[in-house]
Regions:
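Juxtamembrane "helix exit" motif at the C-terminal ends of alpha-helical transmembrane segments
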Residues: 71-90
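Short alpha-helix boundary/capping motifs
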Residues: 78, 85, 102, 159-160
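Hydrophobic alpha-helical transmembrane segments
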Residues: 88-101
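Single-pass alpha-helical transmembrane signal-anchor segments
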Residues: 73-76, 100-111
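Conserved non-transmembrane functional hotspots
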Residues: 2-70, 81, 94, 108-188
Length: 188
């Protein structure tokens, strides 16, 4: 019984795959695993805190927008009502009130612009998703056997660079976000 070249090639490929897996497994050590796992766990916590911060800024933006809409509606209604008032003093009082409400509306809009709440909400939400994606990928890789993971040097380099990139791109967190994280996960 002779073995064809194709069969020899297939057997060689299977043996090479086994050798590659063995070499890959030997490239891993506990220090690499611990460092990568720790970065993944930190990324998970940062995802939680940035998602919470995104919700805070989105809520603030929505409140300021609603207050502005309500105040503008009141000022507009007062201006319309003032047109139908015959008494000059009453008309002036209504117009001054409408002007005051208009000033209040301008103040609310200035606050919204100053805090830039919409942009902060979007940036915190985006970085939260990126930290979540990082955590999922690290969890998947570290959940595999040493033979089936990406090579240790490749995964370590990627994990370090991506974690540092995310840290650099992330907006600062509020103290309330950090406190909520500590309170929520105090038993861990």
């Amino acid at each position: 019984m002779s073995v064809s070249n194709e069969e020899n090639f297939a057997l060689t490929q299977v043996k090479m795959a086994g050798i590659k897996k063995k070499l890959n497994a030997e490239s891993w050590n506990d220090e690499y695993e611990n460092a990568i796992t720790e970065w993944g766990e930190k990324a998970s916590g940062l995802r939680f805190m940035h998602a919470n911060s995104s919700g805070y800024w989105r809520g603030l933006s929505n409140k300021l927008t609603l207050y502005s809409i309500i105040a503008t509606t009141i000022a507009s209604a007062a201006s319309l009502v003032a047109g139908s008032i015959d008494d000059v003093d009453s008309k002036d009082a209504v117009l001054f009130a409408a002007g005051g409400v208009g000033l209040f509306t301008s103040f609310i809009q200035s606050l919204k612009k100053f805090y830039n709440a919409d942009e902060k909400a979007a940036e915190h939400g985006s970085i939260a998703k990126q930290f979540g994606s990082y955590y999922r990928y690290v969890s998947i890789q570290m959940g595999m056997s040493r033979e089936d993971r990406r090579p240790s040097d490749e995964l370590f380099e990627w994990a370090l660079k991506d974690y540092e990139r995310l840290q650099q791109e992330a907006l600062p967190l509020r103290g309330a976000d950090i406190e909520l994280y500590k309170k929520t996960f105090k038993k861990f």
